Amino acid sequence: MQPSTLQTLTKKALATQHVSKDDYYILERCGLWWHEAPISMYIDDDNQIIIKTLCYKEGIKLNTALVLAVKENNDDLIMLFTEWGANINYGLLFINNEHTRNLCRKLGAKEELETSEILRFFFETKHKITSSNIILCHELFSNNPFLQNVNMVDLRTIIYWELKDLTTNSMLNEIPFSEMLTKYWYGIAVKYNLKEAIQYFCQEYRHFDEWRLICALSFNNVFDLHEICNTTKVHMSINKMMELACMRDNNFLTIYYCFALGANVNRAMLISVKNFRIENMFFCMDLGANVIEHSKTLADIYGYSIIVNILSLKIYKANPILLSKETNPEKINTLLKNYYSKNMLAYDICCIDNYL
């Protein structure tokens, strides 16, 4: 970190103030100017400096702003952000000419980053879950040759963990590292329903349409699932879609949507039992699944004694309010937002009665 000077502190103070458009020329002369617009800053709840510009209205972390300045070979901003406390070493990930390399050396950068430092920057940058930041992360990391220096096992482990709810996680082993990162950012966008980011990836990577569908089903995003089914040609059977939805417990929204489109709810119950998804199993019975004896036999084969005990009770039946087969995602969300399985409630009451 460079020592603070009066000029540095003045610029920092000015960047936190509201400045009228008539006075923008002052900001430009002070170097608080980027992409033809003023730079402002604030301190977030984690006591981190956040930089805002016309291009990054939601804000980006100071270290992220630095690496973007390095990528653009913007000497003035590299020096400014370093003076404000950015880690100049992170700039090594994006240096693309010798002049910028020498400037970073002059500002205190070492010759190369360790794997732990690269992973730390990766975590810091992706922390902000917004459309603009996920797109930015994709642009920074997905095709970055410097990431070839990272221990692939470490980074792949991180990605597998964050996408652990996906039922096709193993397929990430079979693709190039840059493609895996692209799918990772796309998956995060779908997981958190970041509409602008989803549209960006949809337009840029149309050959990943099936990946988007898998993510929507696995992450219980009924809104994006509805969008996919109504705007693209789906090359997956409805029962396969239901199978993917059932692999993660509490995926009531996407399970219901597949049910409404005609998926076999008995098959869904068997899949839920096989994978020990107890809440999904109860929900399937709410939807009218009645393969209780078959499910009990399957649970016994897999050694799921708790499921065998649950299904031994003769108390389960469909919930009439779920049988209308609604496909409007807003209505589905309203119906199921705070839903508690009617059959699970019946089981709970039975257990309490037996205890008493």
Swiss-Prot record:
Cystine pairings recorded for this chain: none
Q: Which UniProt keywords apply?
A: ANK repeat
Q: Where are the ANK repeats?
A: 61-93
GO BP, sorted A to Z:
taxis
Q: Write out the similarity annotation.
A: Belongs to the asfivirus MGF 360 family.
Q: What does this protein's UniProt record list under function?
A: Plays a role in virus cell tropism, and may be required for efficient virus replication in macrophages.
Protein's name according to its UniProt entry: Protein MGF 360-3L
Query: Which species?
Result: African swine fever virus (isolate Tick/South Africa/Pretoriuskop Pr4/1996) (ASFV)
